[in-house]
Amino acid sequence: MKYIDIFELSRAKTEEKGHLTIDDLPDLKEMLKSETPKADIHWKATGTGLRRRLASALLTIDAKLTTDCARCGKSLEIEIVKEVPFLFTKTEDEANRLPIEEDGDDEIVVGSTKFDVAHWVEEELILSLDLFPADEDCEPDPESLQSQDEEEIPERVNPFAGLADLMKKNS
């Protein structure tokens, strides 16, 4: 685990970078539906001084993730390249007091002098994933589309079928 002082990074306008694998990111590993999920992630956090009177940084991620295609079940490599600007508050209350319309493109996060980089990167990757990752040009596996329980659906009975007979009896 790598921890950084996010406020010092911002103030000094320095840069931290590193590499993460799937074993560093347990929540992402659970989300990648595969027997052997993989992740090769390079990240860089660059302090950008104060913006809107708050500590700020730019997180750059270059990741290659391997999971299974939701349609055909074959191995699927997903590439995620993104830059996300962040503003850091010192408390949750301070973050909640910021007007929503002033967020702009910046993500607002509660910072720390012991900020968990792996969790930060993992959260951004999870937000970038499709719910059902799939190849753009694959065909669905017909067997996976078949219902596991091919039980016959019982014929529905019309609830009003006996209404006419009931009305005749009561008249």
Residue locations for each model-derived region?
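Charge-rich, low-complexity linker and terminal segments
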Residues: 1-13, 87-171
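The −1 position to Zn-ligating cysteines in a subset of zinc-ribbon hairpins
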Residues: 68-71
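A positional/architectural concept
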Residues: 1-66
